[in-house]
């Protein structure tokens, strides 16, 4: 029995989909415990590239059962569009399970998300506009609509009417928009009821029963540590907890059942949207990382901001997630660049910080303190063992391991499933 949680260690787009795809073929369940269709990931299988947004990467595994956990917020239109797109390419989505306790994203959530971002202007967070934040806000305010509610029309209608009592006041009086008819929302949800019903289960019970039977469960966190609503660069964060603790809450798998916490981290750093980013590059190297690394957001289409590896963030992520292992991705992107700077600490108004500063104001003003290492010139995309890597590449990985305080168990040397070096296999360890 193993319960493994996968967590992004930076600001997202680290390659969690690849990690899930590699491990997902050897586990019995792959669970998405948080987020919605706001966090895309790319998986390359058999030379074909799949871009997933709401569904877990385990949907492409032939054996694993994919699950959307209770912590996910689900846009039904986006869900079935994604399913249909995969099925058109020959994928089998019939094994998908959805928690009855997951919350639903309503059309009014998307409307409010877009209107509020425009209203904020320069103070906007930079959301995807897909209604994720408003859906989570309703969940916490206890006025959200859950998956199970669409199977009882009277409860559904009552919840929608109650939610729109307040939201229509906001739309009309604050944002000068038209009120939304509750009946159109009820009809929208009911139109998906028959297709949804076969997928809905008590996922918490099913997952724990599977673990009791000695099966393997992989939890695939969305977004990343630095976007966590509590532990990230607030307020430039998502609306859920995409850290290891959040995976437990969003799946119903208790924390003592988690055997490995696997952090996914790039050999450099990227970020999409607004917010502080100490190692961000504005020169030719930033453009090089964007171009060579293919740094364009799957979900937003926005070019990612790029910077050097930040070991302060890596240590912080290891601590708040209890990482047992790291999966280092995109090492190949750094081939042939001469020297590679590594951020080892911050300078904030003349004071050195080896760990995360206490306040967001300090973090916003943090300047990176770098050490440099020589890059390698050799093509590493065909390397299959750590020993096959050029010595300079090995030295770089070992230095990141030392600075991060967590072993680098997997190393990505290309986008393909088979372009991964395995130093320690979490599924072979107790």
Swiss-Prot record:
Q: Which CDD domains match?
A: AdSS (cd03108)
The organism encoding this protein is Corynebacterium ammoniagenes (Brevibacterium ammoniagenes)
Give the SUPFAM superfamilies listed for this entry: P-loop containing nucleoside triphosphate hydrolases
Q: Report residues binding Mg(2+).
A: 13, 40
User: Any idea what this protein is called?
Assistant: Adenylosuccinate synthetase
**What positions does the entry give for IMP binding?**
13-16, 38-41, 128, 142, 223, 238, 302
User: Which UniProt keywords are given for this protein, alphabetically ordered?
Assistant: Cytoplasm, GTP-binding, Ligase, Magnesium, Metal-binding, Nucleotide-binding, Purine biosynthesis
Q: Report a single Gene Ontology molecular function.
A: magnesium ion binding
- Of which family is this protein a member? Belongs to the adenylosuccinate synthetase family.
Complex and partners = Homodimer.
Which residues act catalytically here?
13 (proton acceptor), 41 (proton donor)
The processes (GO biological process) annotated in the record are:
'de novo' AMP biosynthetic process; IMP metabolic process
């Amino acid at each position: 029995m193993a319960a493994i949680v996968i967590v992004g260690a930076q600001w997202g787009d680290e390659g969690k989909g690849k990690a899930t795809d590699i491990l997902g073929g050897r586990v019995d369940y792959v669970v998405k415990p948080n987020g919605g269709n706001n966090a895309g990931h790319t998986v390359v299988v058999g030379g074909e590239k799949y871009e997933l947004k709401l569904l877990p990467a385990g949907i492409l595994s032939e054996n694993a059962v994919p699950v959307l956990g209770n912590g996910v917020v689900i846009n039904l239109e986006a869900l079935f569009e994604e399913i249909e797109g995969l099925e058109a390419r020959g994928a089998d989505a019939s094994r998908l399970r959805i928690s009855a306790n997951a919350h639903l994203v309503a059309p009014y959530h998307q409307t409010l998300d877009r209107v509020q971002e425009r209203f904020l202007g320069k103070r906007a967070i930079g959301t995807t506009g897909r209604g994720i934040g408003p859906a989570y806000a309703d969940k916490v305010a206890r006025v959200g609509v859950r998956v199970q509610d669409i199977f009882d029309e009277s409860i559904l209608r009552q919840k929608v009417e109650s939610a729109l009592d307040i939201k229509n006041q906001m739309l009309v009086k604050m944002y000068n928009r038209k009120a939304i008819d509750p009946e159109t929302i009820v009809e929208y949800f009911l139109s998906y009821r028959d297709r949804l019903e076969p997928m809905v289960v008590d996922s918490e019970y099913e997952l724990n029963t599977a673990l009791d039977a000695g099966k393997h469960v992989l939890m695939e966190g969305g977004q990343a540590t630095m976007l966590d609503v509590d532990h990230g660069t607030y307020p430039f964060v998502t609306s859920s907890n995409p850290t290891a603790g959040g995976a437990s809450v969003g799946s119903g798998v208790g924390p003592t059942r988690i055997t490995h916490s696997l952090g996914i981290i790039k050999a450099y750093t990227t970020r999409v949207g607004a917010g502080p980013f100490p190692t961000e590059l504005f020169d030719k190297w930033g453009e090089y990382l964007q171009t060579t690394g293919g740094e364009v957001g799957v979900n937003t289409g926005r070019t990612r901001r790029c910077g050097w590896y930040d070991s302060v963030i890596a240590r912080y992520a290891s601590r708040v997630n209890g990482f047992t292992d790291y999966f280092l991705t995109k090492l190949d992107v750094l081939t042939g660049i001469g020297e590679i700077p590594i951020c080892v600490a911050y300078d904030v108004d003349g004071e050195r910080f080896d760990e995360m500063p206490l306040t967001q104001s300090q973090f916003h003003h943090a300047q990176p303190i770098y050490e440099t290492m020589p890059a390698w010139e050799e093509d590493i995309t065909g390397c299959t063992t750590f020993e096959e890597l050029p010595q300079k590449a090995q030295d770089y990985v070992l230095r990141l391991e030392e600075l991060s305080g967590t072993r680098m168990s997997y190393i990505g040397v290309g986008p393909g499933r088979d372009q991964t070096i395995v130093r320690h296999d979490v599924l072979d360890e107790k």
